[in-house]
Design a protein with these regions (language model features):
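Active-site rim elements
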Residues: 96-105
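A general structural signal for short secondary-structure junctions and capping/turn motifs
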Residues: 10-14, 107, 112-116, 158-160
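Residues that mark the start of a beta-strand
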Residues: 17-19, 121, 209
Length: 212
């Protein structure tokens, strides 16, 4: 797991500035999908099959999903087409980055949209969130608000987390580790709300030191 720092200043929980915080970058999921489909080496049917499989079964690893997709497709392919898939496997595995990033784009949007629909404001630090604000105004015109504070260097995060009550996290698509937003929140007295993975379920207790 990644380490995280503790702020030099400890702020009492009920005095903290940010009720709900998310830190990270933003890219519109539709834009990312369009760009990914323009990349050389992207097998579009495979890409769409992989994304759907991972969204349907979030605890599935990417490598396992790749093999399941290949197995599923082989049943309907000729021997020549099966051979082509096997030959293209290295490039197909290389594109796992795109699956991970695209799904994170989707989940970040969905998480924040649902909070806004519930009337919950969210404070955000990171890159590109002005684009999400425009999107959110169209989708949730009368809900909660995004308060965008711009980009900051990583070494400022401990003091920002120490001034936050609840920290949100969306994991990258690995199952045997965690993102540093989680220990950063814990080290600075935040309630950390995250999706789950094998590592977190083995090492943390839902409702005790994290909320899934």
């Amino acid at each position: 797991p990644l380490a995280a720092d503790t702020s030099k200043e400890w702020i009492p929980y009920d005095k903290r500035k940010y009720p709900v915080l998310f830190t990270g970058s933003y890219m519109n999921s539709a834009t990312f999908l369009h760009n990914a489909k323009q990349c050389a080496g992207i097998d579009q049917p495979f890409f769409e099959q992989m994304v759907q499989k991972l969204l349907d079964r979030p605890m599935l690893t990417q490598s396992r999903a790749v093999w399941e997709c290949i197995r599923d497709r082989k049943a309907d392919l000729t021997k020549q087409e099966q051979k082509e898939i096997e030959n293209n496997l290295p490039s197909m595995l290389h594109t796992q980055y795109f699956f991970d990033m695209y799904i994170r784009c989707i989940l970040r949007e969905e998480m924040l949209i649902q909070l806004l629909k519930s009337g919950i404001d969210v404070d955000v630090y990171g890159h590109n969130w002005e684009l999400f604000i425009e999107y959110a105004k169209l989708v949730v015109p009368d809900g909660g608000k995004i308060h965008y504070h711009g980009e900051v260097f990583y070494d400022r995060l401990p003091e920002i987390y120490a001034d936050s009550q609840i920290v949100l996290n969306i994991l990258p698509w690995f199952k045997d580790g965690m993102h540093d937003r989680i220990p950063m929140g814990m080290n600075n007295g935040c309630v950390t709300v995250s999706d789950s993975c094998d590592y977190l379920e083995e090492n943390l207790q839902d409702g005790e030191n994290i909320l899934f």
